[in-house]
Amino acid sequence: MNRYTDQVVLVTGGAQGLGAAMSERFATEGAHVAIADVNIDAATALAARLQAETGHTCTGHAVDVTDSAAVTAWADELAARLGRIDVLVNNAGIIRDNRIEDIGDHDWHAVLDVSLSGSFYCARAVLPHMRSRGYGRIVSFSSMSWRGNFGQANYVAAKAGIVGLTRTLALEVARQGITANAIAPGLIETPMLASMNGPARDKLIAKIPQRRTGTPHDIAEAAAYLCSPAAGYVSGIVLDVDGGLGIGSSIR
């Protein structure tokens, strides 16, 4: 199934982890994937591998999403060269966890600048190109923690902001063939989670109704649906991809 044949898909933070899984998913379905990451070596290496494996053009780009002028220039250059921008996935983000009184100004601003401001800058940059063709899909990454979580005030503020940004964006573009949605991942299998000791890991998994962690593949599948033509009547939602954890459980 090639839902993205000839489409241009932009993925920020697209060179590693969940971003890499999504970049691969879109490439396997025929998209030209523009992989943006501050780690240009990782981005270009992944793009080269995906292009070799899928036969579809993939490119790596050094993009700092906190630089609004650079983001706009990147989007404009891609649109001019490729003739279109169909999909934006706002995945770039960082974590600087601490109690509120121990979060310094730098760590507060760093998290919001990358996750929230970066998502805003990227969405603003691609909108003119989507509007001109009457089609677009924007998916931004929130988190199950957007409702509040101990020791993550900066992260929670950013992820809650993404929910508000997504809903407002969905309203503003509702009659322009563009949708905007957010994904809120739960506990996803990552190197950090895998490194946890057995009891601590088991305690977390016991809170998940499905009794397993999610995988990058789970996230990539969710993104591939929301960004597809089939999801044209889905807009303004927060899709929990958490194995049911958000039904009523909380992490302590």
Enumerate the predicted regions with their spans:
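Substrate-binding pocket helix/loop in short-chain dehydrogenase/reductase
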Residues: 99-100, 107-112, 204
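Alpha-helical segment proximal to the catalytic Tyr-Lys
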Residues: 128, 171-172, 232
